[in-house]
């Protein structure tokens, strides 16, 4: 153990110690990272995970948290730290390499030409870029013997995505903590930063005076040059909306996050699962079907009359049921409706 510690660079060692010794970082970074891994079963024993590093604060912190989790050795797993260069300029590439060296993260860099592919796309270039990046990362991760890729999306990303899906997409969906790849057999995507707040990531970054990339793509650079980057991002607009709502309701962020853990399917008009759409009317009539067995029907009707309805007519109207049919079925077992008692006897 001493030999390992002596090989760690002094600055990296200080960063690692801050994660376990500073209360805020230990509770809000290390513990929440481990909690998400446990709650969503993100890591299984003996897996190899490709930690995908973009050069931003989120993914770099994720790399350090994975190293800390591995040091605990509660779950045996392997790590590869993967950086894709989609066409960074020299300065941005250098900054990623410098930060990785400074933080003692042994990165593997590979090149792609994604920026050139999307820079002239007018509609949704960011979405296309993200999709293409993910495909390249899956492919390289497989080549390295990994079965999962880990992305650095955090709690704030989750709630913003949830709200964006409603406001801009006309649907209800969220950013999932893990997903099966649809194009790479046996591969999964995990998001272990799921419980971590962006403000705590920023606090960690600033505590160590670290400088990370933001979005280094040419599309963003062009928009910033035109002064239009703010209006180009629906995510930024959604972020501002959440902050505005938070002024009158401090729990709004937690409520958005928790809403995706408390979906009442009985109270939605329609939903999709596995590519198939289900409408509440599909089962609406089935839910109102009365039991066929006369004795079960008797118990069901008498219970309803006792607890909720003053007359048989009211019950039948509410259930859209045929009163005569019910009376015939129950008369077959020698039960008739007594209006005074409001029950079948």
Language-model segments: residues:
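Short acidic, Pro/Gly- and aromatic-enriched capping/linker segments at domain boundaries
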Residues: 321-336
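Short, basic, helix/turn surface patches
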Residues: 132-144, 178-184, 238-259
